[in-house]
Amino acid sequence: MDAALLLNVEGVKKTILHGGTGELPNFITGSRVIFHFRTMKCDEERTVIDDSRQVDQPMHIIIGNMFKLEVWEILLTSMRVHEVAEFWCDTIHTGVYPILSRSLRQMAQGKDPTEWHVHTCGLANMFAYHTLGYEDLDELQKEPQPLIFVIELLQVDAPSDYQRETWNLSNHEKMKVVPVLHGEGNRLFKLGRYEEASSKYQEAIICLRNLQTKEKPWEVQWLKLEKMINTLTLNYCQCLLKKEEYYEVLEHTSDILRHHPGIVKAYYVRARAHAEVWNEAEAKADLQKVLELEPSMQKAVRRELRLLENRMAEKQEEERLRCRNMLSQGATQPPTEPPAEPHTAPPAELSTGPPAEPPAELPLSPGHSLQH
């Protein structure tokens, strides 16, 4: 093991455990760096916090892309391919590690770490919710401490050697790709390819959310991005309506209206979702709000009210038939024999049978198009 090497960076010490091959790679902006890592505490047991090899999932970052844990870019750009090195990093570099670790664990579990529908960035969420969902990370968050990173550099790719995902793009590139994704989503929606369309809208939303975290909330540029996000989210919700994912529509539209109570289309889309799950009063209230804010949509609102009335009538008729069938089945069953011996226990409560299942879903109205 080589002696500890200072990287000329305050609060960082490096120890090479296994030498790499070749020259130092050409780390330029946009280079993709792939590596395995293990994170440990500086206690006597060197307690392991995270280990990418345990989930068989190498990590990668893009140079110059403002990675959450900036010190990792410094560490990696000091290494050769196949080198294994241990880095001691002081608290000034490790304060945001719990947030990064949470995202990595979510990815390993197959969850979406971007949480694109959340209005605040990761750092703000940390203070808003007070917990990261993992006891060890909450402890690190509460009491930041130096950490040890053991890193093995596997591969370095030039920007032209790989297909860049949208989240890897620069801010300027993200702004340019959003209208492209938006237009592609609209095209796919018109073709009835709702799953693909929803993916395009979601990808555009992720880009805009990322850009929005760099702006001051409620100022002009932030609000401009927010308006674009809301438009895309409502288009995404229309895909969800077509896929019959009504409760997710209710979640997204309600979130929009909590922050922006004057968006007509959010009320309209939410009304349609309420109607699909037989929330009659809520659907009517939202449609009434649409009329108050946009009287020119009276024709569309009347159509939705007729559909709602038909759906509720069909539901009531099906429930009447179900009850009638249950009563007729009960009347034809032979009486049960009394028990052989009397007992003193109180009689069991009579079961009313399983709750009525909702009727089959009716087809959605082709009605009012809200695509942009």
UniProtKB/Swiss-Prot annotation:
GO molecular function, one term: peptidyl-prolyl cis-trans isomerase activity
Cellular component aspect of the GO annotation: cytoplasm; nucleus
PPIase FKBP-type domain boundaries: 53-145
Recorded superkingdom: Eukaryota
InterPro entries: AIP/AIPL1/TTC9, PPIase_AIP, PPIase_dom_sf, TPR-like_helical_dom_sf, TPR_rpt
Start and stop residues of the TPR repeats: 178-211, 230-263, 264-297
Positions of region (Disordered): 315-372
Primary location: cytoplasm
Quaternary organization: Interacts with NUB1.
Function: May be important in protein trafficking and/or protein folding and stabilization.
Name of the molecule in the record: Aryl-hydrocarbon-interacting protein-like 1
Organism whose genome encodes this protein: Papio cynocephalus
Gene that encodes the chain: AIPL1
